[in-house]
Amino acid sequence: MAETKSAPIFRNRVIDKKQLKKLIGWTFAHYGTAKTAVVADDLKALGFRYATRAGVSISIDDLKVPGSKAELLESAEKRIQETEDRYTRGEITEVERFQKVIDTWANTNDELTDRVVKNFRESDPLNSVYMMAFSGARGNISQVRQLVGMRGLMANPQGEIIDLPIKTNFREGLTVTEYIISSYGARKGLVDTALRTADSGYLTRRLVDVSQDVIIHEVDCGTSRGLFVEAMTDGDRILIPISQRLLGRVTAEAVLDPSTDEVLAEAGQDINEDLANRIEKAGIKKVKVRSPLTCEAARSVCQKCYGWSLAHAQMVDMGEAVGIIAAQSIGEPGTQLTMRTFHTGGVFTGETARLLRAPVAGTIKLGKKARTRPYRTRHGEEALLAEANFDLVLEGKGRKETFAILQGSTIFVQDGDKVAAEAILAEVPVSGRTKRTVEKATKDVATDLAGEIRFQDIVPEEKTDRQGNTTRIAQRGGLLWVLAGDVYNLLPGAEPTVKNGDRVEVGDVLAETKLTTERGGTVRMGEDNGSSTHREVEIITASVVLDTATVKAEASQGREHYVIETKGGQRFNLLAAPGTKVTTGHVVAELIDSRYRTQTGGLLKYSGVEISKKGRAKAKQGYEVTKGGTLLWIPEETHEVNKDISLLNVEDGQLVEAGTEVVKDIFCQTTGIVSVTQNNDILREIVIKPGDVHVLDDPDTAAKYDEGRLVNAGEEVFPGLTAEQLVWAEAVDGTDGPLLLLRPVQELVIPDEPPVPSQDSSQESSSRSIRLRAVQRLQFQDGERIKSVEGVDLLRTQLVLESEEGSSQLSADIELLPDSKDPETLRLQLVIIEPVVTRRDVASDTTHGSTHTELRVKDGQKVKPGAVIACTQIQCKEAGVVRGIQEGSEAVRRLLVERERDCVTLDLDVTAATQLQPGSLIVAGTQLVDGIIAPESGEARAIAPGQLQLRIARPYRVSQGAVLHVEDKGLVQRGDNLVLLVFERAKTGDIIQGLPRIEELLEARKPKEACILARRPGVAHINYSDDDAIDIQVIEADGTQADYPVGPGQPLIISDGETVDAGQALTDGPANPHDLLEIYYDYFREQLGEDYEAALESLRRVQALLVNEVQSVYQSQGIDISDKHIEVIVRQMTSKVRIDDGGDTIMLPGELHELREVYNSNNTMALTGMAPAQFTPVLLGITKASLNTNSFISAASFQETTRVLTEAAIEGKSDWLRGLKENVIIGRLIPAGTGFKAYEESLLTDVDGGYEDRVYDDDLADVVIDDRAARSYTLNEGRDFSRSMTFAEGESMILDDGEELIDDSSASLRNLVDVDED
C-alpha cells in the first residue's frame, strides 16, 4: 500500500482490549510485520507510562456496593416469603417452591449485577475495578459481581443448587455458613482444573499424532468439490456470522449477488475481509468454498483447499505443516473448557424464554382470535398457554401497545386485567427452541411436624411392577394433611395399655413390652455396672461339668494350652479355648495317646473293626468307630520324590540296609527290599519294605503271592517254610530272580467303648440336655496305603459335644469354673445360654418417649419357660388425649397423644352463624366468619357457641403421579418422608459438555444415550400404547413401513405426521456417528447407484456434523477456532474405508484403505474388466486413526509399540518417511518449512507415479541431508532423493527371489502389466 502524507485522523473513543486487538490487526493487514512491531512497542510504552502515572490499583474504597442492593434483596425476600406462605398453605408443591426460590434469586442476582455496572458507569467511570474488568485487562463481570454485588446461589457436592444464596459480597464479608457453602464449589474448581490440564494435554498429543503428516504439498488439486458454508446459529442467536466463517477461504464456484446477479467473487478467489463483508451485506445465506475435507491431493491438502494461513492473512505457504497447526489450535483452548456443567434443574427462565414486560401501566385486551387454555407454570402459578399465534393489546394513557404472542407462550395476565408498568405480561419461547428437552426428576418431601395423616382429594392407586413391588401413586393430586400430635414409636412386641380417647398424664404408661424366657433355666446376672436398670441377664438352660477332672494350663513351644487330667490318669488336650462357643458335634478335647502311633508309613487292614456309614465319605475328622476290633498294620517306608532317574543309587528289588543313600540326599531308615516307581524317566516314589526274604523257585508259588496276602501263625507259606507269627507274604522281583518277602504285621486292639471322664449335667427341662461323648476316629480306611516316612496316628479318641434334642445347631459356651471345695482347681463346664437383652434407657431414644425398664428376677433364681424376665414401659411425656391407635389393624407400631399445644381456640362472635362442620380442614388465611381469619391451618373441632377449636395441621400439596409413602390415617414422626414428587425439568444444555464432549466426538465414541435415527425417509406416525411405550412408524413413499420402538425416558422431538429424512433424529439425544454414516451410505448407494459417490456424500454429511458439533462446544465457552483446523482433523478421521470383498484387487476383506486408493484401484480393475473391491466407509477416532497411519514408525511411537512393530515386520511394510514424526525419530530433516524444498521432488515424483524409463546415475546420491545443506536447495533446482539404488543398463529392480520391490500404494496402480520395459 502506497503511503500518503495525509493529516492524521483523531478518533475519540475508549480503547479497550477489543479495540486494541482490532488496531493491531488492522496495522498488520495494512503495513506488515515490522511496522506492527513498532506500533505495538509504542502502545506498550504508552500504556505503561500512563498506568504508572495513574497508579491504578484496587483499594477497599474502590469496591462500591450499589445503594439499591438492600431494597433489591428485600423485595426478593418478600417474594420468597410469599412463595413460602403459599407452600405452607399447600397451594404449591415442594418442587414448585424450590423452582420459584431458585429463579427469584437468580433473577435478583442478574438485576443486581446490572445495577452494579450502572452504578459504576454513572457515578464513577474511572473506578479502577470498573476499568480493569470492562477494558478486558483483568477480571470479568462475574468476579466484579462477587466483589460488590452478591455471591449468589451455590451448588452442593452433588451438583444441586442450595436454595439459600450467599447474599453478601466479599466487600461486606461472608458469614461462617456462607464461607463453608462457598468451599464446595471452590474445591471442585481446583480439582477440575488439575484434571483438565492433564486431559487437555493428552487430547493435544493425540491430535498432533493423527495430523502430523498433513503438509501443504501442491498448489491446486483441481477438484470441483466443495462445502457450503453458512452462519452458525443457535435458535435466534448467531454464534458465528457468515463473514467470519468465509474469511480466508477460497471459493469453489462464482458468488453472485442474489438481487443484481453481479459476480461478487470468481471461482478460486480467496475471500478477504472486505469481500466477506460484501457477501454478508448482499444477504447471501450460503457460499460454496474449497475445504480440506473435499481436497483430492494425495495424503495432504493443497494450497487452494486450505486457503489463508491465519498467521499472516495470506495464502498458506508450500511445506506448511498445517496438520500440527490444526492440532495445536484445537488442543490449546482445551484447558479453558470446563469439565462438567452443574446439573441444576432448569436454571433461569432468561435463557430459554423472552419475558414481555408492560412498558406503561394500562389495561389488557386479548383479541377475539386468542385461543388459550389454563396452564400451571413450573412455579405453581395459574397462567394461560397460547394455542395459536395472536396479538395481545395493552391500552395505556394515550398509547396502545401490541405484542405478538406465539403459540406455546405463557401468558400471566387475563383479559381486562389492569397492570402496572414493568409488570411481566408473558413469556415467549425463543423460536426454534420451542421443543425444550425435558427429563423426569424426583424430589422427596419430608414432614415438618409429627402427627396423623389425612388425604384430601388425593386418589391413591396401587401399581405393581414386573418384580412384584407395589407402589402407591396419587392418581389425582390434592392435599396431604399432617394433623399435629406427639407420636410415640412403640418397641417391637409392645402392647398399648391405653385406648383411643383416653386422657393420659405425664408418667402414665402408654405401652409395655414384656421380655420372657423361651426355655427357662437358672438366671445368671452379669456384672453390676452401676446402672440399676441395665444388667446383662443370661438364663442357663442346660450345663455339663467334668466334676472329677482337673484343667491345667501347660506351655509348650512358647504357647499356652489347657490339659484335662482325669482320675484314671487319662490326659486330654482341650481344643476349644475357654470363652468360645462350640456347636453340637464339635470336638472339645482329644486324648493324648501314643499307643496308635506308628514308626513309618504302611498298609492298614481292619480286622473286625466297623466304622459308621455316615463317615464313609472321608470326613475331616476321620471315620467314627462303631464297633471295636483289631487293626493290622504292615509298616513300609515311602519316599515320594520327583527327580531324574539318573540320581537313583539302588535298583528295583535290591535289598538295602538302614542308612543307605537310595537317591542323592535321601537315606532310608529301615532295612528291606526297594521298590521303585518311575514315569518317563522321572522318579515318583521309592518304597522300602522290611521283612524276611526267601528265594522262590516255583513260579506257581510266586503267582499265589503276587498280590500279597496275610499268613496266620503256624500256617505253611510254601513247602518247607511255616510262619511263626502273623505275616504279610508278598512276591517281589529281586535283582537276581523272584523273591518272597514275609513282612511283619503289628496288631492294635480298639475297645468298643472308649473311657469317658465322669460328668455331672443339669438342665431345666428334658428338652435340652447336653453331654460329652467319647468318639474314636480312624484316620484311614480299610486297605489304605499311607505313604509316609514319619509315623502317623491311626486312631484318635475325642470328646464331642452332644445334645439329646434334634436341633443340631445348639451352641454351648466353654467355661472354666473354680471348684467349690478347692478354688485353686479348675473344672471344665459347658453351658447353653439363652441371652435376654434388656433395653438401655437412653434419653435420645427413637421412641422419643421415656422408656423405663425393670427386672423381675434375681441372680440364681430358677425360672420356668415363658416367665417374664424384664418389663419395658413407654411413659407419657406430656399430658393429652390418646389418638391414632388403629383398631383391628396389625400390630400397633405407633400411637399419638394430642397435647394442649396442638390445639388453638378461637373466640367467635356468639351470634355469628358458622357454616363449618366439625372435622373440616381449614387452610390458614381462610375467612371463618365475617372478620375472623384462620391464623393457622388445621382441623375444625368442638364448636361450642362462640368458640371454635382448631387442631393445628400442615397441608402439603401433592401433584398428580407422585409416589405416596404414607397411608391415610397413618402416623408419622417429624422428618419422615411423606411423598416422592415426580416432575419434569428442562435439561440444562448438553449434559456432557466441554472436554469430555470434544473427546467423545473426536474419538467417535458411541454416546451413552444415543437418539433413534430414521433409516429411510418417509412420514412418521406415532403410536402410544398403554404402558408408556411409544412406537414410531415411518411410512416411505412406496408404502413400506419401518418400526422404531422408543424406550422409556427417550423424549420425542418429531410430531405425528411429520416428514423425516434419512438419518434424522426421532428422539432426543446425541447421534451415534457410526450409525449415521452407515444409514447415509446405504441410502445414497441406493439413490446414486455408485459406491464411491455414495461414500463421499455420506462421509461429507458426517464430516459436517462433527465439525459443527465440535465448533458448538467451543462456541458455548466463547472460544473462536477457525473451521479449517477442525476440518483437517476430521479429514484424517474420515479418509479410510473397510474392504468388504477384495474382488480381483490385492486388498483383503477387513483391511482399512484410503478411499482414494481404493477408487484408483477400482478404476484400474474397470479398465481390465475385472471385479472391483466392495467397501464400506468407516469413521475412525483419532487414536485409531493414528494407529492406522501409513507410517509404522509414527504409529509405534504413539501407542501399542510392540503390536505395531510386530505387524509391520510380519507384513514387510516400508515406511516412506512422509510425515514429520517419523523423520524426527530417525534424525532426518523434517519435510516441512525449509526442509520441504529439499524433499519436494522426492514427494512429488512418488512411487505412485508411472514407471517410465529411468536412467540412474552411477554415483549414489546421499539421501540423508542435514539442515545446512537443505537451505541451499532452491525450489527450481530440487534434486530427486527417491532413487537410492543404481542399476546398470537393462536391469530392473529384481531381488534374488524374483520378487519385485513395490509398496502397497503403487501396487494398485500397476495396471497388472509387467513394468520392466527396458
From Swiss-Prot:
Keywords: DNA-directed RNA polymerase, Metal-binding, Nucleotidyltransferase, Transcription, Transferase, Zinc. It catalyses: RNA(n) + a ribonucleoside 5'-triphosphate = RNA(n+1) + diphosphate. GO terms for molecular function: DNA binding; DNA-directed RNA polymerase activity; zinc ion binding. GO terms for biological process: DNA-templated transcription. Its EC number is 2.7.7.6. Binds 1 Zn(2+) ion per subunit. GO terms for cellular component: DNA-directed RNA polymerase complex. Pfam families: RNA_pol_Rpb1_3 (PF04983), RNA_pol_Rpb1_4 (PF05000), RNA_pol_Rpb1_5 (PF04998). The keyword Nuclease does not apply. It comes from the Bacteria. Its cofactor is Zn(2+). Zn(2+) binds at C221, C295, C302, C305. The keyword Electron transport does not apply. In cyanobacteria the RNAP catalytic core is composed of 2 alpha, 1 beta, 1 beta', 1 gamma and 1 omega subunit. When a sigma factor is associated with the core the holoenzyme is formed, which can initiate transcription. Belongs to the RNA polymerase beta' chain family. RpoC2 subfamily. PANTHER family: DNA-DIRECTED RNA POLYMERASE, DNA-DIRECTED RNA POLYMERASE SUBUNIT BETA. DNA-dependent RNA polymerase catalyzes the transcription of DNA into RNA using the four ribonucleoside triphosphates as substrates. This is DNA-directed RNA polymerase subunit beta'. It comes from Synechococcus sp. (strain ATCC 27144 / PCC 6301 / SAUG 1402/1).
